């Protein structure tokens, strides 16, 4: 009799296709080559964890074992994402008769980790795949990594710039790199002209367009005419005129736009590309910029975190790679053909869609205890509160201040916000109460810091698909929330994909101990989380494990295991001199009190290990 598979409880067929599955052992497994993964090549995540834990790492402080939490990286998945993106664009170019090519870049801000950036440059060599930088540190990383790239790979220099940034970008051109300085505002042109003359290096520049096309929701907040970056079309044409007067219009090669991360539908993808292509054509035809070669469509290629393919929220997109590529190629081709302008090279800065799938965060369960119910907040009383609040609509702007006015409108907006927040809190509490009344809710204490591992959850409400690593052939019987070990009430994950307020989990019983522990994976987490992580309570980054496929039979090899920062290293980032300010002071006081022999080994262990809990007893559920 076939064992049951409860993977679909977590919608793994939605968000996980084609990289994640549940194997015959009831374990989460990775399909390292996506749809090209052959039978027997799936990598068992549970086995990876236990092999990693058995690894001995030699450090200056002696041999150590890995600690939780940990990030598992699968570079084979990263390569497949890159190959799939290029296949999608190459297919769209070939099928439409587009008379140029696609040549993309990876925005370093998405994941600055050395292995990730270097892998992408290596994997993308045949595609002339390049990098995008938005700061001087990122530019230095790009310059070093692209030294090994195929000549001609783009080094797109975005972000606000000072003279040092511009000079560094010009030095990259002097090194033979294809660095393009993208102007965010007109004033940056003066810096480029000045530094070019000083260094004797002729630049290649681009301009960033502020499009009128917008996307809804959180990720569209920096787009449109009121957006933070770029210039409106008229200002771009002024820049072209300024270059023409200086006899430097040949410097201008690229037009860049970015309407926001996580574009939800292909209609918006198409409209943005068509609008930008119109500006590109005007620069070529009406403003004499005949040397233009490239349209950089920026980021926005989304990830379907909730697996619905609906595009109806910030967590979902209603398309795949092929539809995205086709929308851009078709829009630019038709616009350029209508204007009689040669088709430009198409570039995208697709970071989230490249990096998300290749990395997962592994969280260790420490204990599980029932969440106490507030006896006064029965679901009937909560529903009554919601109905009562709904009947008390905030005053209109007109009644606030006679005829209204700016102050009245602002006051009304503030009241609406407070009203909405209170309604949301009550509705959320009602949802949890109904769930708890039916089955009870358990708080699973996890060896993690929300602020260090999934900061986007805390910061913007970003949701990641989460599921147990093992026991997926057993029905999960507990409604759980995840509680971290920080001293902060925000350190809790109690919202999940598909509008769930709990995550189906298993009891922490003898079966959990038999599996060597109970682990929950946060998936599609390879973009932004490490870069945005903070040090709340001085918890640090995780252990990093690099895993590669080793052929059939589920074979894999652990290429490297890197421990996360030690307590000593984290304390040092807060400007403490660990020896003078910490070690020497503790030694002095402990010696004076005659307890140094006891304190010394404890202090040493505390400083030289990761700040998370270590050597924790097997987890249990309190019923």
Curated annotation (Swiss-Prot):
<dbReference type="GO" id="GO:0008792">
    <property type="term" value="F:arginine decarboxylase activity"/>
</dbReference>
<feature type="binding site">
    <location>
        <begin position="295"/>
        <end position="305"/>
    </location>
    <ligand>
        <name>substrate</name>
    </ligand>
</feature>
<keyword id="KW-0210">Decarboxylase</keyword>
<keyword id="KW-0456">Lyase</keyword>
<dbReference type="InterPro" id="IPR002985">
    <property type="entry name" value="Arg_decrbxlase"/>
</dbReference>
<dbReference type="InterPro" id="IPR009006">
    <property type="entry name" value="Ala_racemase/Decarboxylase_C"/>
</dbReference>
<dbReference type="GO" id="GO:0006527">
    <property type="term" value="P:arginine catabolic process"/>
</dbReference>
<dbReference type="InterPro" id="IPR022657">
    <property type="entry name" value="De-COase2_CS"/>
</dbReference>
<dbReference type="InterPro" id="IPR022644">
    <property type="entry name" value="De-COase2_N"/>
</dbReference>
<comment type="similarity">
    <text>Belongs to the Orn/Lys/Arg decarboxylase class-II family. SpeA subfamily.</text>
</comment>
<dbReference type="Pfam" id="PF02784">
    <property type="entry name" value="Orn_Arg_deC_N"/>
</dbReference>
<keyword id="KW-0663">Pyridoxal phosphate</keyword>
<keyword id="KW-0745">Spermidine biosynthesis</keyword>
<keyword id="KW-0460">Magnesium</keyword>
<feature type="modified residue" description="N6-(pyridoxal phosphate)lysine">
    <location>
        <position position="109"/>
    </location>
</feature>
<dbReference type="InterPro" id="IPR029066">
    <property type="entry name" value="PLP-binding_barrel"/>
</dbReference>
<protein>
    <recommendedName>
        <fullName>Arginine decarboxylase 2</fullName>
        <ecNumber>4.1.1.19</ecNumber>
    </recommendedName>
</protein>
<dbReference type="GO" id="GO:0009446">
    <property type="term" value="P:putrescine biosynthetic process"/>
</dbReference>
<dbReference type="InterPro" id="IPR000183">
    <property type="entry name" value="Orn/DAP/Arg_de-COase"/>
</dbReference>
<comment type="pathway">
    <text>Amine and polyamine biosynthesis; agmatine biosynthesis; agmatine from L-arginine: step 1/1.</text>
</comment>
<dbReference type="InterPro" id="IPR022653">
    <property type="entry name" value="De-COase2_pyr-phos_BS"/>
</dbReference>
<keyword id="KW-0661">Putrescine biosynthesis</keyword>
<dbReference type="GO" id="GO:0008295">
    <property type="term" value="P:spermidine biosynthetic process"/>
</dbReference>
